[in-house]
Amino acid sequence: MEVLPPLDWEKVGAETWGDVGGQIKQMGIGKVAKGLLLSSIQERTKTWDGIFRPVRQPEWWQGDGEYHGPKYTEPVSELERRLKLGEFVVACEIAPPLSASTNKLNSNIDLVKPYVTAINFTDNASATPRMASWACSKIAIERGAEPVMQIAARDRTRAGLQGEILGAAALGVRNVLCVTGDSPVLAPQPRGRMDINDLDAIQMLWILRRMRDEGRYLDGREVKFPPKFFLGAAASPFASTPKFQALREHKKVNAGAQFFQTNLVYDIERMEIWLNELAKRDILNKVYILVGITPLKNLKMARYMTDVPGVYIPESILKRMEAAEVAGNSQEEGVQIALELARKIKGYEKQGVHGLHIMPVGWEDIVPRIVTEAGLS
């Protein structure tokens, strides 16, 4: 279970290679060179391990490759309750406001609440500051909605994570989605430092599962009143080859993930390949999967999405959007594509899919129509 592996982002960032460089200096550049160039295979392997293992496997990390199911039996949230009952659930995402005003946030919550089981609030998506996910989650609870609080490792230390989760639990938050977080390279200038990454999503899941199920802080102290929450993680079927992505998802399940919300899916056949890879690892019966979709507003948005890491849009969909753009009805075509995808995704209930996660990207008004016309209400 490595720290900041290449599969988290498009490529390894400077923060990882900086640690590697520091480890080489600590071992001695001459000793490393000799170990890699002049020694036997065994010595070369030992040298490589000496460089990378301290970076990838910090001393405090005690995770393993085994599955650790939740220690509780009764659902802790409405989302978990419905999933356990076998319902095909619908969740949606609302972007937190860029200011302290909650007017638009309140109206969006009220708009989608009758149509979805849970509402996900992102945590500084694209490394851009917004209202905190825990604050949006508390507002949702006050308005009678079920929140999914997203928490990004990018902005957390080990101490900060544990303190924040206790506060969220005290506010009534029961669904937590752990993500590594978008790279700070996406942030507006002046950006924060790129070399501070204390945790990744897998380690977050492991820490939070232990707090909940074992009643222990990372340092071993007892949590007298452990927090209760349904632990989730992000999954990205197209971020790399399905075989390697399934390995990443497997690690998250072993660490504590009980449900996945996937990145955008526009190619159902490739999604099926990913599901088959998960099945080979025998984890489909250990995690609930909510597949993500976003309605395309226009051709420009479709083309932009093709450059987003982890998103794949088939040529057939791009051609449909191009034709619709010429005809002047690209927005409606985008809705029809989303409806087709939603119906097809629901058809995978017996193959490991348990729900739909709609990411409207500021187009919350379209959520009721998608849910209703796709037959999901």
Give names to the regions the model predicted.
Residues 43, 47, 101-102, 127-138, ...:
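Active-site-adjacent beta->alpha loops and helix N-cap segments on the catalytic face
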Residues 89-103, 147-159, 229-244, 323-336:
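Active-site mouth loops of central-metabolism enzymes
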Residues 119-129, 151-152, 178, 259-267, ...:
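Catalytic beta/alpha-barrel core
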Residues 1-20, 45-52, 67-78, 181, ...:
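Active-site pocket-lining/capping segments in soluble small-molecule metabolic enzymes
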